[in-house]
């Protein structure tokens, strides 16, 4: 009897151990793969870098902003976060246009720009009053508007993106450079563009070299200029170098001494940037900023060249939603109709 009792005890012990092993395996099998699966599903999202794109939406040209956003979103698989900047009286309209159109799927934030930061920094100028609009200076204040990003893309509203914006975002900024721009002398079609009457591509076209403050900079007037309508910016360097403060200093000096004006090349927003960033910026692939499409309504690019371009910019007076203008078919293909019916195309005289 004693032997039988011991055998039963051993069998019972083995049964308990077996049950424990089975239970452990079942629990382990049910949990570990789930964690692995979670890791596999979450890792791509965690590793996918968010690309912040800053673009302004002015009341009278909001359709331009929406077309630009549509072209960017439609030509990339990247994770884009649009920062749409406007004045207080336009914020509701911006949101309604996005949420009640094909753009409703985009990831976006609406940012209010307070024009009071410009008080005393803009000299009244009647030659091109549109260049004095507050949103034209948003690019000066990027770190104050965008906080959690190391690298940011800024775009003017009168652009269309035909390439993958990821390529532009991947632009390499040299050590110590706060921004990258496209040089005006590096355009692939420079010979054709330079035939446009009044086009400037040097500092002489932007700064008044008769003024002592400009002469004292020691910058040759024949130095190639750049266009700040497309910017890839490093926010850490921007803040470290106090770029915004430097720009404001030259804005105030212009109010006092009239160092530049919109009657010259790029007007009041480009000139201070040319001064502050002189010799301290990286370059963007020229195909990522094909510009001057709004300079002359009679000047046209070849179709082949336009197809090669990654980004088209209608800088100048002749906008593609208005008349007269050129290559407006390329712009209109990305146009998002205004749900409120306020913004309308004007392609006829």
Curated annotation (Swiss-Prot):
State a GO cellular component annotated for this protein: membrane
> Which residues are on the Cytoplasmic side of the membrane?
1-6
User: Which InterPro entries does the record match to this protein?
Assistant: Glyco_trans_8 (IPR002495), Glycosyltrans_8_dom-fam (IPR050748), Nucleotide-diphossugar_trans (IPR029044)
Q: What class of enzyme is it?
A: transferase
Q: Which UniProt keywords apply?
A: Glycoprotein, Glycosyltransferase, Membrane, Signal-anchor, Transferase, Transmembrane, Transmembrane helix
The record's EC number reads: 2.4.1.-
Q: Please give, as recorded in its UniProt entry, the membrane topology of this protein.
A: Single-pass type II membrane protein
According to its UniProt record, what is one Pfam family this protein matches? Glyco_transf_8
Kindly list every residue the record annotates as glycosylated.
Answer: 234
- State the compartments where it is located: Membrane
SUPFAM superfamilies from the UniProt entry? Nucleotide-diphospho-sugar transferases
| A GO MF term | UDP-glycosyltransferase activity
- The membrane-spanning stretches of this chain are 7-24
Topology, Lumenal side: 25-349
> What PANTHER family does the record point to?
GLYCOSYLTRANSFERASE 8 DOMAIN-CONTAINING PROTEIN, GLYCOSYLTRANSFERASE 8 DOMAIN-CONTAINING PROTEIN 2
Which protein family is it in?
Belongs to the glycosyltransferase 8 family.
**How is this protein named in the record?**
Glycosyltransferase 8 domain-containing protein 2
């Amino acid at each position: 009897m004693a032997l039988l009792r011991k055998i039963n005890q051993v069998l019972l012990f083995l049964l308990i151990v077996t049950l424990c092993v089975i239970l452990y395996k079942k629990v382990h099998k049910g949990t570990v793969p789930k964690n692995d699966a979670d890791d596999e599903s979450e890792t791509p999202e965690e590793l996918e870098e968010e690309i912040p794109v800053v673009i302004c939406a002015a009341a009278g040209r909001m359709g331009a902003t929406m077309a630009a956003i549509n072209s960017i979103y439609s030509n990339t698989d990247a994770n884009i976060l649009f920062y749409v900047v406007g004045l207080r009286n336009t914020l509701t309209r911006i949101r309604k246009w996005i949420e009640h159109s094909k753009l409703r799927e985009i990831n976006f934030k609406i940012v209010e720009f307070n024009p009071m930061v410009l008080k005393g920094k803009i000299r009244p100028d009647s030659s091109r009053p549109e260049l004095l609009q507050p949103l034209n200076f948003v690019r000066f204040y990027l770190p104050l508007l965008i906080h959690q990003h190391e690298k940011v893309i800024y775009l003017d509203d009168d652009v269309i993106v035909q390439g993958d914006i990821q390529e532009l975002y991947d632009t390499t900024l040299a050590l110590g450079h706060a921004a990258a721009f496209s040089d005006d002398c590096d355009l692939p079609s420079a010979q054709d563009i330079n035939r446009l009457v009044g086009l400037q591509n040097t500092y002489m076209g932007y700064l008044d070299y008769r003024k002592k403050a400009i002469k004292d900079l020691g910058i040759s007037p024949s130095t190639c200029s750049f266009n700040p309508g497309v910017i890839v910016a490093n926010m850490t360097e921007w803040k470290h170098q106090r770029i915004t403060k430097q720009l404001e200093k030259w804005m105030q000096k212009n109010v006092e001494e009239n160092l530049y004006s919109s009657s010259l090349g790029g007007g009041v927003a480009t000139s201070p940037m040319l001064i502050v960033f002189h010799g301290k910026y990286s370059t963007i692939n020229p195909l990522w900023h094909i510009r001057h499409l709004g300079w002359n309504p009679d000047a046209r690019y070849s179709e082949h060249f336009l197809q090669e371009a990654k980004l088209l910019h209608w800088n100048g007076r002749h906008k593609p939603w208005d008349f007269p203008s050129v290559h407006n078919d390329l712009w209109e293909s990305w146009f998002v109709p205004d749900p409120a019916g306020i913004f309308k195309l004007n392609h006829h005289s």
